[in-house]
UniProtKB/Swiss-Prot annotation:
GO biological process: DNA replication; DNA synthesis involved in DNA repair; double-strand break repair; SOS response
Residues annotated for ATP binding in this entry: 30-37
Alphabetized GO MF terms: ATP binding; single-stranded DNA binding
Family, per entry: Belongs to the RecF family.
Function: The RecF protein is involved in DNA metabolism; it is required for DNA replication and normal SOS inducibility. RecF binds preferentially to single-stranded, linear DNA. It also seems to bind ATP.
Protein name, as recorded: DNA replication and repair protein RecF
Gene that specifies this protein: recF
Keywords linked to the UniProt accession: ATP-binding, Cytoplasm, DNA damage, DNA repair, DNA replication, DNA-binding, Nucleotide-binding, SOS response
The species this protein was found in: Lactobacillus gasseri (strain ATCC 33323 / DSM 20243 / BCRC 14619 / CIP 102991 / JCM 1131 / KCTC 3163 / NCIMB 11718 / NCTC 13722 / AM63)
Domain of life according to the entry: Bacteria
Principal cellular location given in the protein's record: cytoplasm
InterPro entries per the UniProt record, alphabetical: DNA-binding_RecF, DNA-binding_RecF_CS, P-loop_NTPase, RecF/RecN/SMC_N, RecF_2
Keyword match DNA damage: yes
Lineage, uppermost ranks: Bacteria, Bacillati, Bacillota, Bacilli, Lactobacillales
Length: 374
């Protein structure tokens, strides 16, 4: 899979852009704060309809403009797909091959993209919300049902939390309605949790192999999904998970009413990374964090390929300078001939380009792009 051409209008600091891309390696070079990361963000947004940097789509629209537009043609092994997005202050619309999509879940997955940035170090040391967002973004683009259930979960969770707050301040007393919301939320939660268990198991297998190779077989990486409902185990099916979530709601009801919020479910779950049986959150050095993050990204590539039969587009935002020569070589060797790759950097020096053959280089300056001569 590769992005053959790309257009944008009024996105971040870009007024207008139209360009073709190389199917293999594309390098965006230029000083900081010129738009390199914004361009990668735009490509990522075209794929997932979400930014990795903000939850507010309004921030993506260029100051003084009423909307932003993105468009691109994606080549897959069997077909070509035209993608288009339009963002306004009121929301976004999506088109596939000029047909407007009624739901974004029908759009996401047409183009798969994996992003690796310095902020990914937070995957290990950051808050649980960082790891939950990671799961939702990555699993949502490979499974439209996961994306659908995640959207439904947020809506019903908000309803249930609002009603719990009403109960907490004595403005409501209908426990039967709370039962209805609990049953609905538990059913959706079970669908999400069962998929997370499945995908984390696969991701763990790929990441373990990648990490072993990068570390020279010196370290063993393990990734575990940690549901907030402690009774849930990996062998549970959807129905069993549902029953355990419902039981958790009933057990926690007095506390939930007192606090006015739902205390368990996918929105409270977490991931745990172990290095040689030790919790990486507490013990991993910065170098080990980088190796874990890199291993997870390489595992994502394999997971997407397994489930879609296509290699995703890889976006590397200012990470080459963060990796030593060995990790750079491992990364470039791993992706060579597999993925279309976009790399941002301020300087071509000090990077292991020996594996990359004739990359296409673009200069980014003040929201403009120009291809550099070979």
């Amino acid at each position: 899979m590769y992005l053959a051409n790309f257009e944008l209008k009024d996105f971040r600091n870009f007024k207008e852009l139209k360009t073709d891309f190389d199917p293999h390696v594309n390098i965006f070079i230029g000083p900081n704060a010129q738009g390199k990361t914004n361009l990668l963000e735009a490509i990522y947004f075209l794929a997932l309809t979400r930014s990795h940097r903000t939850n507010s789509d309004k921030e993506l629209i260029r100051f003084g403009s009423k909307f932003a537009g993105l468009q691109g043609r994606v080549h897959k092994s069997q077909l070509q797909v035209e993608l288009k997005l339009r963002l306004t202050a009121n929301g976004k619309k999506a088109w596939v091959n000029r047909l407007e999509q009624k739901k974004l879940s029908a759009y996401v997955g047409q183009m798969n993209a994996i992003l690796f940035s310095p902020e990914d170090l937070a995957l290990v040391k950051g808050a649980p919300s960082v790891r939950r967002r990671f799961m939702d973004l990555e699993f949502g683009q490979i499974n439209s049902e996961y994306l659908y259930f995640s959207s439904q979960y947020r809506q019903v969770l908000q309803q249930r939390n609002n009603y719990l707050k009403q109960l907490s301040i004595k403005k409501a007393n209908d426990q039967v309605f709370l039962d209805v919301l609990s049953d609905q939320l538990a059913g959706i939660a079970a669908e999400i949790i069962s998929r997370r268990i499945k995908y984390i198991k696969k991701l763990n297998s790929y990441a373990k192999a990648a990490h072993s190779e990068i570390s020279g077989q010196a370290e063993k990486l393990q990734i575990f999904y940690r549901p907030s409902v402690k009774e849930i185990i990996p062998e549970d099916n959807v129905e069993t998970i549902y029953r355990k979530v419902i039981t958790s709601y009933k057990k926690n009801r007095p506390n939930e009413i007192r606090k006015g919020t739902t205390l368990s479910g996918p929105h409270r779950d977490d991931l745990e990374f172990l290095i040689n049986e030790k919790n990486a959150h507490d013990f991993a050095s910065q170098g080990q964090q980088r190796t874990i993050s890199l291993s997870v990204k390489l595992a994502e590539i394999q997971l997407v390929h397994e489930l879609t039969q296509e290699y995703p587009i890889l976006l590397l935002d200012d990470v080459m300078s963060e990796l030593d020569h060995r990790r750079q070589s491992r990364l470039l060797n791993y992706i060579h001939g597999k993925t279309q790759t976009f790399i941002t950097t301020t300087d071509l020096e000090g990077i292991s380009w020996e594996i990359v053959k004739e990359p296409k280089v673009y200069h980014i300056s003040a929201g403009t792009i120009s291809a550099k001569e070979s």
